Swiss-Prot record:
Mg(2+) binds at D35, E140. Keywords: ATP-binding, Ligase, Magnesium, Metal-binding, NAD, Nucleotide-binding. It comes from Methanosarcina acetivorans (strain ATCC 35395 / DSM 2834 / JCM 12185 / C2A). Pathway: Cofactor biosynthesis; NAD(+) biosynthesis; NAD(+) from deamido-NAD(+) (ammonia route): step 1/1. This is NH(3)-dependent NAD(+) synthetase.
Amino acid sequence: MDFEKAQNRIIEFIRNETDKAGVDGAVVGISGGIDSALTATLTVEALGKERVLGLHMPESSLTPAVDSEDAKILADWLGIEYRTIDISGIVSAFMASIPESESSDRLTRGNLKARTRMSLLYFHANRLNRMVVGTGNKTEILLGYYTKYGDGGVDLEPIGGIYKTEVWELSRRLGIPDPLITKKPSAGLWTGQTDEAELGISYLKVDDVLRMIEEGAEQEKILKDTGISIEQLNSVTRRIERNEHKRKSPPVPELY
C-alpha cells in the first residue's frame, strides 16, 4: 500500500463527505484503541481540531483504566474537545426495566453497550449539526466483527478500506502515541475480551487470508501460504458469509 496516497485520500474523503452533508464537523468515539486513534487523527487533519469532538464512553466497572488514560492522551495530543460519559447508569437502567435481562448472554449485553454508545454519539452529532465518523477497519467490516447499529451505526467509515495491520502501520507513520499502537486490540464488551482470542486467529494471519480470498485464491493455496489450520480458515469464511447482512442496507421487496 502507498500509505501517503491512502492518507491523503482518506482526508479528502472526510472533507468531501462532510461538505456534501452540510454539517459543521464530526463526532468520533474514542475508546483508547488504535482504530479510533487513527480515525480521530485523520479527521482532525481533514477538518481541523476545532470541528472534532471526541467522546470516551467507558463502563466504570469494566473499562480498563489504561484505556481511559490513553483516550485522554490522544485527545490532548490532538488538541480536540473531549468528553467522558460513563455508560454504566444508562445500561443498568435499561437492564433493570426488562425482566428478561437477567437471563441474557454476554453477547446480547455487549451489543447493548455498543448501541448505547452509538446513541450517545448521535445525540451529540445532532445537537452540534455534525456527522458521526466511524472507526471500523476493513478487517472488521469483512468479518462482520462489529455490532449492527452499534459501532457499525455511523455516517462514514474513513478507515474502512484499510486492513488492521495497515492501521498499525499508518498510525506509526502519523506519530500516534505508541501505547495506543502496541496494546492488544479489544472491543471491551466483557472482562478479559481480546479481538484475537475471540477470532481464534491473529490479525496478521487473518489479513493475509482476507487478501487472498479477495484475490480469488484456492483453499489449498491459502492454507499453504499462511500456515493456518482448516478450522481457522473455515471460521473466517463462515464469519464473512454469516455477517453479510451487516454490510448491506436492510432488504426491501421488489413490488413493481
